[in-house]
Amino acid sequence: MEAQSSSRQVTGPLYLGVKEDWEEQHDVKAEAFLQAGEGRKEKGAQGQPGVGAVGKEGEGEELSGGEGQFGPGAPGPMGDEDKDGGTRAGGVEEEQNEPAAEGTESQKNGKPEDRQMPLQGSRFAQQRLSELQSILQRTNSFDVPREDLYRLMDTCVARVQNWFKIRRAAARRNRRRTTPVPEHFRGTFECPACRGVRWGERCPFATPRF
């Protein structure tokens, strides 16, 4: 028992010493790794010396309204391209406006002959009617051959026939309006004699007017 306790007392300090040595080595490695990382960061920052200046200048440009070396009035290829583009766009707009102005001038100075004339359908019908009336007045009869009317009026026979039909219907309508109506015909429509009575004749069954 005494031998075992003595061996434990001997191995205990040895184990503690080994553990302390391992912890010290681990701390040394960690410090070396951190120092190496910081050195890399410093080298990267030294390799880009204008980064901070550019960042400050960019912030100043944003605060001043965005006008800097790359603005619209800056000297260089960008400013020249803007000028060229502006002149080109202005030339295209002028070319587009010139044909429109020419078109308006031509419309203003256009001849009246070029404009579309209104239709003369009513005048044409009135002219044909006057010709037909003059023909009927000279002959004083409705028995004029339709072929002569067709030849004189320069129209087809069907139109002449249709015109005569319309004129007859109009004459009958006017005659009915001017002729008197039987007295009792206004009161009743059941008189058997009035059904066969002509316009203008008096019905034999008509009652005397008081």
UniProtKB/Swiss-Prot annotation:
GO BP term, example: cell differentiation
> Which InterPro entries does the record match to this protein?
HD
Top-level taxon in the UniProt lineage? Eukaryota
Its function, per the record, reads: Transcription factor required for differentiation of embryonic stem cells (ESCs) into primordial germ cells.
**Could you name the Gene Ontology cellular component terms for this entry?**
nucleus
Q: Where is this region: Disordered?
A: 29-117
Q: Where in the cell is it found?
A: Nucleus
| Keywords assigned by UniProt, alphabetized | Differentiation, DNA-binding, Homeobox, Nucleus
Q: Which Gene3D superfamilies match?
A: Homeodomain-like
Q: What does the record give as the DNA-binding region?
A: 117-175
- MF term (GO), any: DNA binding
Report what the protein is called. Answer: Homeobox protein Rhox5
PANTHER family under this entry?
Answer: HOMEOBOX PROTEIN RHOX5, MCG113260-RELATED-RELATED
Q: Which residues cross the membrane?
A: none
